[in-house]
Amino acid sequence: MPRRGPFLALFAGCVSRGASRSPPGHTLTRRPMDPVFLQIGNFTIAWYGVLMMLGIAAGYWLGLKLARERGLNADLFERMILWMLFWGFVGARLVFVLTSWHIFEGIPFPRVLLDIVNLRNGGISIHGGLIGGVLTLIYFARRYRLNFYQYADLAVPGVAFGIIGGRLGNIMNGTDTVGRVTGWPIGYHWPASARAFHEGMCRPNPNPDMDLSKYCHEVGGQIMMTAPVHFTQLYGVIIGIILAVASYFWLKSRVPGWAFWQFWLWYSILRAGWEETFRLNPLTIKTYLNQGLDAPGIGLWTDTQIFSVPLILVSLWMLWRLRQRRQVTVPTVPVQSQS
């Protein structure tokens, strides 16, 4: 495969995302909040793909810049980034399929295989993408006998920018990462122009905890989900911005691995404690659920929240080890007594 083959494959998968939601001849002026960025005939470019790739491109450029400044092998790191993107995307889709198998149950073989690889209706997991990227980096570090953490640290800003772009794309898609119904003042009413959101949320959901169709009414000749919800997509954007800003300070430390494990710690805390708490996801271990027009819109525990607990503990332990190692390696200057 050519050097940029993984990048092109990733882009091709992203740009078509959400194409099935928009009819041919669609124009952006008619639907300001539409998944489709551009449509030419049957060729569709989705906002999700455009925004995510812009975020990744920013991180790609910054990572190479940092690699050159630190005297690392920038050409090799560029190859790493491209393959990390490719296998990260594969991991993101694979984890989504495994954790959302109920979507694919009952689909006959071999059609189910086509549905698994079909990204037009969305479905990726950020944690799966991170795992795929980390495994790729481990492979390169072992093959070329590199310090894994020196290169892993440089990928942190790119991941943060990718989160920002992806969550902005989720806003345009409408039906992705939706929040729970809430009576808090922070509740967001989706505009009538966000047809993908209203059409998606007004379809009956077999899971009563996730069924918002009871809040749907006809307004101005259009079906609309009228209840306020947590704007969890925006929460995700803010989390990405926080991580991007924080990575600037984490990378000031020359201790390899410091930025890498700080990212895992704070992404897990913010994602599980903030975004996921208010997000309309299935509750794997249902210990608390309080949602509705007179409720805060909180649910515990989702798959992501459960998975984040060991990640937080491991990250804290690794950061403690790095701090201890740094204290041991700092040379001490002997104090000479004056006679």
From Swiss-Prot:
Q: Pfam families from the entry?
A: LGT (PF01790)
- On the tree of life, the source organism's domain of life is Bacteria
Q: Return one GO MF term.
A: phosphatidylglycerol-prolipoprotein diacylglyceryl transferase activity
Q: What class of enzyme is it?
A: transferase
Q: Which NCBIfam families match?
A: lgt, PRK00052.4-5
**What function does this protein fulfil?**
Catalyzes the transfer of the diacylglyceryl group from phosphatidylglycerol to the sulfhydryl group of the N-terminal cysteine of a prolipoprotein, the first step in the formation of mature lipoproteins.
Tell me its family. Answer: Belongs to the Lgt family.
Question: What name does UniProt use for this protein?
Answer: Phosphatidylglycerol--prolipoprotein diacylglyceryl transferase
Q: Which gene encodes it?
A: lgt
